[in-house]
Amino acid sequence: MLTIESIETIPLRIPLPFTYKGSYYEMRNRCAIVTRVRTAEGIVGEAYNADEDEPLQSEIRAIIHDELEPLLLGQDASLVERCWQTMLPVTFDQLRPRWYAMQAIACVDTAIWDAFGKAVGQPLWRLWGGYRDRVPMIGIGGYYVPSDGSQKGNEIEDEIDFFRLEHGMVGMKFKIGAKLPQDDVARLVRARRHAGDEFLFVVDANQGYTVSEALVFLGMARAEGIELRWFEEPTRWHGDARSLRDVRMRGNVAVAAGQSEHSRVGMREMMVAGAIDVSNFDASWGGGPTEWRRVAAMASAFDVELGHHEEAHLGSHLLASVPGGTFVEAFSPDRDPIFWNLIVNRPELVDGHFPLPDRPGLGWELDEDYIEAHRADR
């Protein structure tokens, strides 16, 4: 028995040194919510999730404390599926975006799993299946340089050196989609020349292209001798799964998507439509590890590989637990100071792989001083 007594949330917000621009979005802060589920037995489940800035950060925390916590008080945290189903009704409000509630559930579900792992003395990657104890890591970069002079102009090369030389990562997810295809190809060629042929590349348009633009990009990249591990979110939202399928079939390229879905239902539609080769469903946004594992089970029936959108501290456990896992992802320290500074016992890569901890639960020790220094509620 793990009787839930209370839930604590701590919002974190760290301003970034400059604006990071993707296709149609900009990032100025790195944010997270630290969630702690306290039990009567003294075990505390702890996790951080939900990379959302204000006002959504406050909205998610309000859902946790005003709606989820009253439902869970007195419940047994070791009955994880029951806890998840107990939380599900908060998604039924049709006048509120459903993904707000799914992110709130994700925060609590992750912390509940951490508590359960601690109670049974097992790390989550092993508890969830234990397929391997380390996962290859790729970096995320290639953001567009601002025109205000705040950056030097050699950021692509510096990022690659950080990922490849300093940390031994096996590849890079490269941002495209804000420029014309030929301009993005030129940026990718520059990156490939600097990185060398053994460094793999994924491209991520963040829904920036039309189908035609995505196909032009692929043709030009191939003419330069560049092969991609996959093409992530190549097309705009209104094309739905059909556009992804068109790029996949007409472009003869592996397509990844899923981070913009917030439940297994949306992932089911993508898989049934033959739209993706790789799911990058995000457990920290979409209902937590419980929902991610449902997506993973479904993906195995469709021969779809598994990634995880960002959040290496959680994605590594999930991807290590299943046969179809691909790469865990990490930003540079400027883009994600939380990953590089919050986790006290973050391991160094071994031959390009991120080792999983043997400690129970998620196994991470969070830096209390860092949390206190970057609280957004003070």
Predicted features along the sequence, with ranges:
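Metal- or metallocofactor-binding catalytic centers and their adjacent structured scaffolds
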Residues: S6, R38-A119
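Glycine-rich, aromatic-flanked loop segments that form ligand/cofactor-binding clefts
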Residues: D109-V145
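Short Pro/Gly-enriched beta-strand edge/turn motifs at strand-loop
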Residues: I14-K21
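Conserved, mostly hydrophobic/aromatic
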Residues: I4, G42, L68, V108, ...
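Flexible C-terminal active-site loop/helix
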Residues: L2-E5, L12, E26, A32, ...
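Active-site mouth loops of central-metabolism enzymes
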Residues: R98, V135-E157, I176-A178, A205-V211, ...
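Catalytic domains of carbohydrate-active enzymes, especially glycoside hydrolases
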Residues: F162-K175
